[in-house]
Design a protein with these regions (language model features):
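Gly/Ser/Thr-rich phosphate-binding loop
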Residues: 2, 7-10, 21-133
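Alpha-helix capping and helix-loop boundary segments enriched in small/acidic/polar residues
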Residues: 7, 210-211
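Alpha-helix/helix-capping structural signal
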Residues: 14, 95-96, 161
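Residue-level "edge-of-site" marker
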Residues: 14, 118, 220
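Switch/connector loops and helix/strand junctions flanking conserved nucleotide-binding motifs
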Residues: 17-19
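Conserved ATP-binding/catalytic segment of the ANL
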Residues: 141-208
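Conserved small/polar residues in nucleotide/adenosyl-binding loops
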Residues: 214-221
Length: 221
Protein backbone atom coordinates (compact mmCIF):
# COMPACT_ATOMS: atom_id res chain seq x y z
CA UNK A 1 0.00 0.00 0.00
CA UNK A 2 2.80 2.42 0.88
CA UNK A 3 4.41 1.85 -2.51
CA UNK A 4 1.21 2.34 -4.48
CA UNK A 5 -0.53 4.91 -2.24
CA UNK A 6 -3.92 4.28 -3.88
CA UNK A 7 -6.72 6.75 -4.48
CA UNK A 8 -9.27 3.93 -4.25
CA UNK A 9 -8.88 0.66 -2.37
CA UNK A 10 -11.27 -2.23 -1.76
CA UNK A 11 -10.70 -4.22 1.40
CA UNK A 12 -12.18 -6.60 3.94
CA UNK A 13 -12.98 -5.41 7.49
CA UNK A 14 -9.93 -7.20 8.86
CA UNK A 15 -7.69 -4.56 7.28
CA UNK A 16 -9.37 -1.78 9.23
CA UNK A 17 -9.38 -3.87 12.39
CA UNK A 18 -5.60 -4.07 12.15
CA UNK A 19 -5.36 -0.31 11.60
CA UNK A 20 -7.56 0.31 14.62
CA UNK A 21 -5.56 -2.11 16.77
CA UNK A 22 -2.32 -0.40 15.74
CA UNK A 23 -3.66 3.03 16.65
CA UNK A 24 -4.95 1.81 20.01
CA UNK A 25 -1.57 0.26 20.75
CA UNK A 26 0.15 3.54 19.89
CA UNK A 27 -2.22 5.49 22.12
CA UNK A 28 -1.63 3.11 25.02
CA UNK A 29 2.14 3.50 24.64
CA UNK A 30 1.91 7.30 24.54
CA UNK A 31 1.64 9.60 27.54
CA UNK A 32 1.10 13.25 28.39
CA UNK A 33 0.09 15.90 25.88
CA UNK A 34 0.69 13.69 22.85
CA UNK A 35 -1.75 11.08 24.13
CA UNK A 36 -4.31 13.73 25.02
CA UNK A 37 -4.13 15.18 21.50
CA UNK A 38 -4.57 11.77 19.88
CA UNK A 39 -7.65 11.01 21.97
CA UNK A 40 -9.06 14.47 21.35
CA UNK A 41 -8.52 14.10 17.60
CA UNK A 42 -10.68 10.98 17.57
CA UNK A 43 -13.33 12.66 19.74
CA UNK A 44 -13.43 15.78 17.55
CA UNK A 45 -13.59 13.67 14.38
CA UNK A 46 -16.45 11.60 15.76
CA UNK A 47 -18.47 14.73 16.50
CA UNK A 48 -17.62 16.35 13.14
CA UNK A 49 -18.16 13.37 10.86
CA UNK A 50 -20.65 11.16 12.70
CA UNK A 51 -22.75 13.45 14.86
CA UNK A 52 -23.08 16.17 12.23
CA UNK A 53 -21.98 15.50 8.62
CA UNK A 54 -23.38 11.96 8.63
CA UNK A 55 -26.77 13.40 9.56
CA UNK A 56 -26.57 16.21 7.03
CA UNK A 57 -25.94 18.88 9.66
CA UNK A 58 -23.25 21.56 9.88
CA UNK A 59 -20.75 21.08 12.75
CA UNK A 60 -20.24 23.92 15.27
CA UNK A 61 -17.60 26.46 14.24
CA UNK A 62 -15.21 25.50 17.05
CA UNK A 63 -15.47 21.84 16.09
CA UNK A 64 -14.76 22.71 12.45
CA UNK A 65 -11.63 24.64 13.44
CA UNK A 66 -10.35 21.79 15.61
CA UNK A 67 -11.12 19.28 12.87
CA UNK A 68 -9.14 21.28 10.29
CA UNK A 69 -6.19 21.40 12.69
CA UNK A 70 -6.24 17.64 13.24
CA UNK A 71 -6.80 17.08 9.52
CA UNK A 72 -3.43 18.71 8.82
CA UNK A 73 -1.67 16.94 11.68
CA UNK A 74 -2.86 13.72 13.30
CA UNK A 75 -5.27 12.49 10.61
CA UNK A 76 -2.74 13.30 7.89
CA UNK A 77 0.07 11.52 9.72
CA UNK A 78 -2.08 8.44 10.26
CA UNK A 79 -3.04 8.23 6.59
CA UNK A 80 0.56 8.69 5.44
CA UNK A 81 1.70 5.97 7.85
CA UNK A 82 -0.82 3.55 6.33
CA UNK A 83 -0.18 4.76 2.78
CA UNK A 84 -3.68 6.04 2.02
CA UNK A 85 -3.19 9.81 2.13
CA UNK A 86 -4.21 10.01 -1.55
CA UNK A 87 -7.29 7.88 -1.02
CA UNK A 88 -10.82 9.20 -1.31
CA UNK A 89 -12.95 6.06 -1.58
CA UNK A 90 -12.59 2.82 0.42
CA UNK A 91 -15.27 0.17 -0.29
CA UNK A 92 -15.34 -2.51 2.40
CA UNK A 93 -17.27 -5.78 2.33
CA UNK A 94 -16.95 -9.52 2.81
CA UNK A 95 -17.88 -9.65 6.50
CA UNK A 96 -19.48 -7.59 9.23
CA UNK A 97 -17.74 -4.35 10.20
CA UNK A 98 -17.72 -3.93 14.01
CA UNK A 99 -19.36 -0.66 15.05
CA UNK A 100 -16.28 0.57 16.91
CA UNK A 101 -14.15 0.06 13.78
CA UNK A 102 -16.71 1.80 11.60
CA UNK A 103 -16.90 4.77 13.97
CA UNK A 104 -13.12 5.05 14.31
CA UNK A 105 -12.42 4.96 10.58
CA UNK A 106 -14.95 7.70 9.87
CA UNK A 107 -13.78 9.73 12.87
CA UNK A 108 -10.30 10.12 11.38
CA UNK A 109 -11.66 11.23 8.03
CA UNK A 110 -11.41 8.02 6.02
CA UNK A 111 -14.28 7.58 3.55
CA UNK A 112 -15.05 3.91 4.13
CA UNK A 113 -18.14 2.69 2.27
CA UNK A 114 -19.65 -0.49 3.68
CA UNK A 115 -21.35 -2.76 1.18
CA UNK A 116 -23.03 -6.12 0.79
CA UNK A 117 -22.96 -8.48 -2.14
CA UNK A 118 -22.28 -11.99 -3.37
CA UNK A 119 -20.70 -13.61 -6.38
CA UNK A 120 -24.22 -14.59 -7.44
CA UNK A 121 -25.34 -10.96 -7.37
CA UNK A 122 -22.44 -9.76 -9.56
CA UNK A 123 -20.98 -8.17 -6.44
CA UNK A 124 -22.69 -5.15 -4.88
CA UNK A 125 -26.29 -5.32 -3.68
CA UNK A 126 -26.24 -2.39 -1.27
CA UNK A 127 -23.84 0.20 0.11
CA UNK A 128 -23.78 3.09 2.55
CA UNK A 129 -24.23 6.66 1.32
CA UNK A 130 -22.19 9.69 2.44
CA UNK A 131 -25.15 11.16 4.34
CA UNK A 132 -27.86 9.46 6.37
CA UNK A 133 -26.30 6.04 6.86
CA UNK A 134 -26.74 4.13 10.10
CA UNK A 135 -23.68 2.65 11.78
CA UNK A 136 -23.99 -1.12 11.50
CA UNK A 137 -25.96 -1.14 8.26
CA UNK A 138 -24.78 -2.23 4.83
CA UNK A 139 -26.56 0.70 3.28
CA UNK A 140 -29.33 1.13 0.74
CA UNK A 141 -30.17 -1.26 -2.07
CA UNK A 142 -28.79 -0.24 -5.46
CA UNK A 143 -31.14 0.58 -8.36
CA UNK A 144 -32.18 -2.41 -10.44
CA UNK A 145 -32.05 -4.89 -7.57
CA UNK A 146 -35.01 -6.10 -5.51
CA UNK A 147 -34.47 -7.25 -1.95
CA UNK A 148 -37.02 -8.74 0.41
CA UNK A 149 -36.90 -10.51 3.75
CA UNK A 150 -38.26 -14.03 3.55
CA UNK A 151 -38.80 -16.93 5.91
CA UNK A 152 -36.39 -17.05 8.88
CA UNK A 153 -35.48 -13.44 8.01
CA UNK A 154 -33.50 -14.65 5.00
CA UNK A 155 -32.42 -12.00 2.51
CA UNK A 156 -33.78 -12.75 -0.97
CA UNK A 157 -32.58 -11.05 -4.14
CA UNK A 158 -34.02 -10.55 -7.60
CA UNK A 159 -32.88 -8.52 -10.59
CA UNK A 160 -30.92 -8.48 -13.83
CA UNK A 161 -27.58 -8.73 -12.03
CA UNK A 162 -28.62 -11.81 -10.05
CA UNK A 163 -27.46 -15.18 -11.38
CA UNK A 164 -29.88 -17.33 -13.33
CA UNK A 165 -28.30 -20.49 -11.98
CA UNK A 166 -25.18 -22.56 -11.39
CA UNK A 167 -23.40 -24.05 -14.38
CA UNK A 168 -24.40 -27.70 -14.87
CA UNK A 169 -25.82 -27.84 -11.33
CA UNK A 170 -29.56 -28.12 -11.77
CA UNK A 171 -30.28 -29.26 -8.21
CA UNK A 172 -28.26 -26.44 -6.65
CA UNK A 173 -29.97 -23.95 -8.94
CA UNK A 174 -33.44 -25.22 -8.02
CA UNK A 175 -32.59 -25.05 -4.32
CA UNK A 176 -31.25 -21.50 -4.51
CA UNK A 177 -33.65 -19.82 -6.95
CA UNK A 178 -37.44 -19.72 -6.72
CA UNK A 179 -39.53 -20.13 -9.90
CA UNK A 180 -40.35 -16.41 -9.76
CA UNK A 181 -36.65 -15.51 -9.70
CA UNK A 182 -35.96 -14.84 -6.01
CA UNK A 183 -32.45 -15.95 -5.04
CA UNK A 184 -31.82 -17.32 -1.53
CA UNK A 185 -28.65 -15.73 -0.10
CA UNK A 186 -28.42 -17.78 3.08
CA UNK A 187 -27.92 -14.52 4.99
CA UNK A 188 -30.41 -13.23 7.55
CA UNK A 189 -31.19 -9.56 7.93
CA UNK A 190 -33.76 -6.81 8.23
CA UNK A 191 -34.57 -3.32 7.00
CA UNK A 192 -34.55 -0.22 9.20
CA UNK A 193 -34.81 3.38 8.00
CA UNK A 194 -34.65 2.08 4.45
CA UNK A 195 -31.27 0.48 5.08
CA UNK A 196 -30.28 -3.18 5.10
CA UNK A 197 -28.78 -4.79 8.19
CA UNK A 198 -27.19 -8.24 8.34
CA UNK A 199 -27.64 -10.42 11.42
CA UNK A 200 -26.29 -13.91 10.73
CA UNK A 201 -25.73 -16.74 8.30
CA UNK A 202 -28.74 -19.01 8.17
CA UNK A 203 -26.75 -21.84 6.67
CA UNK A 204 -24.25 -23.90 8.59
CA UNK A 205 -21.39 -21.61 7.68
CA UNK A 206 -20.39 -18.15 8.76
CA UNK A 207 -17.89 -15.65 7.45
CA UNK A 208 -15.09 -14.34 9.60
CA UNK A 209 -13.59 -10.90 9.06
CA UNK A 210 -10.87 -12.47 6.90
CA UNK A 211 -13.59 -13.83 4.60
CA UNK A 212 -12.69 -17.42 5.38
CA UNK A 213 -15.57 -19.82 6.05
CA UNK A 214 -15.91 -21.62 9.36
CA UNK A 215 -18.26 -24.47 10.16
CA UNK A 216 -20.47 -23.69 13.15
CA UNK A 217 -20.40 -27.23 14.52
CA UNK A 218 -16.62 -27.02 14.81
CA UNK A 219 -17.11 -24.22 17.32
CA UNK A 220 -19.84 -26.04 19.22
CA UNK A 221 -17.77 -29.14 19.96
Amino acid sequence: IKEIRPTLMCSVPRFWEKVYAGVQEKINETTGLKKALMLDAIRVGRIHNLDYLRLGKTPPVMNQLKYKFYEKTIYSLLKKTIGIENGNFFPTAGAAVPDEINEFVHSVGINMVVGYGLTESTATVSCTLPVGYDIGSVGVVLPGIEVKIGEDNEILLRGKTITKGYYKKAEATAAAIEPDGWFHTGDAGYFKNGQLFLTERIKDLFKTSTVSYTHLRAHET
